Amino acid sequence: NFPSMGEIIPEYYLKINSSDLVTLLKRTVFCILNDSQKLEYTGAQFTVNRDILEISATGMQRVAIASVKFDTEYSNDFTVNIPKKTVSEIIRVFEHRNLIEIETDRRQISFKADNITVYSKLIEKFVKNIDRLFMADKYPVKAKIDRKSFIEASKRVSAITSEETPG
């Protein structure tokens, strides 16, 4: 038996298709740091804003943001930061399920599907303003480049950089 984490009195509730959630997590998990002095970089940030779930992660040098739009609107917007180990477990356990019910308060979160429930504590710090890095409406960035030339340039750069090279 596992120790009880305490009852979650849900402040926020969300229902999502498991394949959508797992896809979003797979698109962001590679940016989550394993160990960091800054705790907020060791998790995936879930932000619900009306009818959109956005999951973002950053490892200071990399940033990943993935989102999905819901058919229904949720009345309460919220942001929570979920530890990397929990993200990995969600991907592993819920990949081939139907709907996942997510309940959270300010300290912990639960993911439920069928007869499986995953509980986790939340990271209490957030990475602020990740979305400001990509202000496409204010600063549109578009580039059209030759794929072959880009791959060749990438290979040349990788030949002169190493693991010790910053940036």
Residue spans of the language-model regions?
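Structural preference for solvent-exposed beta-strand-turn elements
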Residues: 1-167
